[in-house]
Curated annotation (Swiss-Prot):
Name of the protein this chain belongs to: Large ribosomal subunit protein uL14
Similarity-based family: Belongs to the universal ribosomal protein uL14 family.
GO cellular component: cytosolic large ribosomal subunit
Top-level taxonomic group: Bacteria
Organism listed in the record: Rhizobium leguminosarum bv. trifolii (strain WSM2304)
Function: Binds to 23S rRNA. Forms part of two intersubunit bridges in the 70S ribosome.
GO molecular function: large ribosomal subunit rRNA binding; structural constituent of ribosome
Record gene name: rplN
Keywords for the protein's UniProt record, in alphabetical order: Ribonucleoprotein, Ribosomal protein, RNA-binding, rRNA-binding
Length: 122
């Protein structure tokens, strides 16, 4: 469950290390984002010579949350950290690699490129 002012790790090689959610997209009164949702983020920490720099405002897809997700079969999945992948306006990832596992729920939200780049899909 991601809301405004939430800090997230970046799970790709775009050059950003930490981002902060500044808006949850999808309706004027929407408060929380979950896995697969698009948010607007501000880059808080970045590596030198990366594709993005500190202070940039980008869109990102939430790929891991510490809040557990219920699946239709009754199982629950949760991660240790909140993480996101930076995307462009065409919903394509900015980085060329994804770090760490991503959940199957991204497939239902049509983020197939992120699933194909991920080393492990849970």
């Amino acid at each position: 469950m991601i809301q405004m002012q939430t800090n997230l790790d970046v799970a790709d090689n775009s050059g950003a290390r930490r981002v902060m959610c500044i808006k949850v997209l999808g309706g004027s009164k929407r408060k929380y984002a979950s896995i697969g949702d698009v948010i607007v983020v501000s880059i808080k920490e970045a590596i030198p010579r990366g594709r993005v720099k500190k202070g940039d405002v980008m869109k990102a897809v939430v790929v891991r949350t510490a809040k557990d997700i219920r699946r239709p079969d009754g199982s629950v999945i949760r991660f240790d950290t909140n993480a996101a992948v930076l995307i462009d306006n065409k919903k394509e990832p900015i980085g060329t690699r994804i770090f760490g596992p991503v959940p199957r729920e991204l497939r239902a939200k049509n983020h197939m490129k992120i699933i194909s780049l991920a080393p492990e899909v849970l």
